[in-house]
Regions:
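Catalytic donor-sugar/metal-binding loop of nucleotide-sugar-dependent glycosyltransferases
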Residues: 298, 307-325
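Long helical/loop segments within the catalytic core of UDP-sugar-dependent glycosyltransferases
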Residues: 103-104, 180-204, 216-300, 311-312, ...
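Cell-envelope/extracellular polymer assembly enzymes that use nucleotide-activated donors
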Residues: 124-127, 156, 305
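Membrane-proximal soluble regions of multi-pass membrane proteins
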Residues: 427-461
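The conserved acidic donor/metal-binding loop of glycosyltransferases
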Residues: 209-213, 310
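Short, acidic, metal-binding catalytic loop of nucleotide-sugar glycosyltransferases
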Residues: 144-154
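A conserved acidic beta->alpha catalytic loop
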Residues: 153, 161-168, 184-185
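N-terminal membrane-anchoring/stem segments of glycan-assembly enzymes
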Residues: 1-122, 172, 379-383, 499-532
């Protein structure tokens, strides 16, 4: 159990206007919660340099080697049904790297600063929307403390409480925030935001999830873009996450997992106007959403659909990789699984909608969104299919199991285990590999549910409030992973023993034994739901 007292004191702003009622939280109870603070001046610029060439060159190289080995396996063994998975993976490789990431441009900090200088006059009114739905009281209080420190004279803060919690209402009153509820919780978070859209009036509004703490200069860095270009509808910044030694391994790894998307992929997509809106840590121009009655009305990933809608309507979505707010990741596997499920479902739902293909987005913008959907599909199918080539080779073609066949997979191992930690601007622990297993299985169940029409709706991120349906998906994912892992382990080691006993050279089976053992080690925390 972690003591949060020191964190509360160390992260409290010196100008905290609510210091008089900060004290009672210290003695309420010692909970397993990390309270974030805004990004430091150093953290603010961590994502400005994307390290594009390292990721692009080695990512493309490792993926090409893997795809080459996969296609050679299909041709050599006649396993042509496997070509469906190989084809999807190859298309993803082409679209993601050759059409988006390798040809994207880096963020230009000098241009950004010029925009600040030339468009810094005036302070248009901004509504700050704080949707809450049963999150931890300490987390909410911590975030609101930093919201009050936003340096913008014409801001008005609204708390959007979908739980109608008297404690939250009282806290909002003490902070001087406006408090909004509604009669029902229709469409969950999306409905909450749409309801607030009808009850607020400022020409711009910002959204902060319950755990995201903004820097005081948040609006000063973003608002000049709207006066610089009157066609910009949304300015999106990264979801930057706290990564500290006193967090659970899930929190630390989850924060590191997101860096690639916000530091590299989003920047590449912004080159073509195809960046994704992620809801929180963004500022919106109200005028652009009036035709839709506010943000998108959908039960999951309303942010992605909102961004798509405004771009389709002729507006622009701008992404700037400045870390201007910091939050915390889910601290347990079940919550992380549910979060990733929603994100995969949102992207898949958008790109499988016929309107997406008929939309006004350019070819390159559609490629940006398509690469996201294909990523979820490839990672989902890989959970079960990645081990199949090795198993088929053992079962049917043991004479062709040669040690150097593993060289097709070697660049991918180097890329994930060595180059990614070197590239990362934050800590990149080995446990990231454990978390990617949970991530992949969440994608698998999201796609399965999309195909079968059994999707889960949105729920607030957090371990205590997980819904039964989410818990069931999580348990099913762990069981499936356990079965696949156990079968692969027993079959690989059993068949290897059999073949070596009958005169085959052990050296040719060593790479397979090593990779199977490594796969078992990597999958185990997800299977066992290990939290420490």
């Amino acid at each position: 159990m972690r003591n949060i007292t020191s964190m509360l004191f160390s992260h409290k702003p010196s100008s905290d206007p609510e210091a008089s009622f900060y004290e009672p939280l210290l003695s309420e109870h010692d909970r397993n919660i990390i309270l974030p603070s805004p990004p430091t001046s150093h953290e603010k610029y961590l994502y400005v340099k994307s390290g594009r060439w390292l990721i692009s060159i080695f990512g493309l190289l490792s993926s090409t080697c893997l795809m080459t080995g996969m296609w050679l396996f299909i041709v050599a063994t006649g396993t042509y049904w496997f070509s469906v998975f190989a084809a999807v993976s190859t298309v993803y490789l082409y679209v993601s790297y050759l059409m988006v990431n390798c040809v994207g441009k880096d963020f230009n900090l000098r241009v950004h600063r010029n925009i600040q200088k030339l468009n810094s006059r005036g302070c248009p009114a901004v509504d700050i929307l704080l949707p809450v739905c049963g999150e931890d009281f300490e987390v909410i209080h911590n975030t609101w403390t930093y919201v009050t420190a936003l340096d913008w004279p014409t801001k008005t803060v609204y708390v959007l409480d979908d739980k109608k919690d008297p404690k939250i209402r009282d806290l909002a009153q003490r902070f001087g925030f406006n408090y909004i509820t509604r009669e029902n919780n229709h469409m969950k978070k999306a409905g909450n935001l749409r309801n607030a859209f009808t009850k607020t009036t400022a020409p711009f509004f910002a959204i902060f999830d319950a755990d995201f703490c903004p820097r005081s200069d948040y609006l000063k860095e973003i608002m000049p873009y709207f006066s610089h270009d009157d066609k910009i509808a949304i300015v999106q910044t990264p979801q930057f996450f706290e990564v500290r030694p006193d967090q659970t391994w899930v929190e630390r790894a989850a924060g590191s997992v997101q860096e690639l998307f916000y530091r590299f992929i989003q920047v590449s997509r912004d080159t073509f106007g195809g960046a994704v809106c992620v809801g929180t840590c963004a500022v919106y121009r109200r005028e652009s959403l009036v035709p839709f009655g506010g943000t998108a009305e959908i039960g999951f990933s309303e942010d992605v659909h909102t961004g798509f809608a405004v771009v389709d309507d002729g507006w622009k979505l701008k992404y700037i990789p400045l870390n201007l707010a910091k939050g915390v990741c889910p601290y347990e596997l079940k919550s992380f699984f549910s979060q990733q499920y929603r994100w995969a479902l949102g992207s898949t739902t958008l790109c499988t909608n016929p309107h997406f293909w008929k939309s006004n987005l350019s070819f390159r913008q559609k490629a940006c969104f398509l690469s996201g959907m294909l990523y979820f599909q490839v990672t989902a199918f890989a959970t079960v299919l990645a081990t199949i080539p090795g198993l088929i080779m053992l079962a049917r073609f043991p004479e062709h199991v040669l040690w150097f066949n593993a060289t097709f997979a070697l660049p991918s191992l180097i890329f994930g285990w060595i180059l990614m930690p070197v590239w990362s601007a934050q800590d990149y622990p080995f446990t990231v590999n454990h978390l990617k297993v949970a991530q992949s299985y969440s994608h698998l169940f999201a796609i399965k549910d999309k195909l079968m029409g059994t999707m889960m709706l949105w729920e607030s991120t957090g371990g205590a409030g997980a819904a039964t349906s989410s818990a069931n998906r999580f348990l099913q994912g762990r069981i499936l992973c356990g079965l696949v892992t156990a079968f692969s382990l027993v079959f690989t080691y059993g068949m290897t023993y059999y073949y070596v006993h009958h005169g085959y050279a052990l050296v040719n089976f060593l790479p397979g034994l090593f990779l199977t053992a490594l796969n078992t080690l990597t999958n185990s925390p997800f299977i066992m739901n290990r939290q420490d």
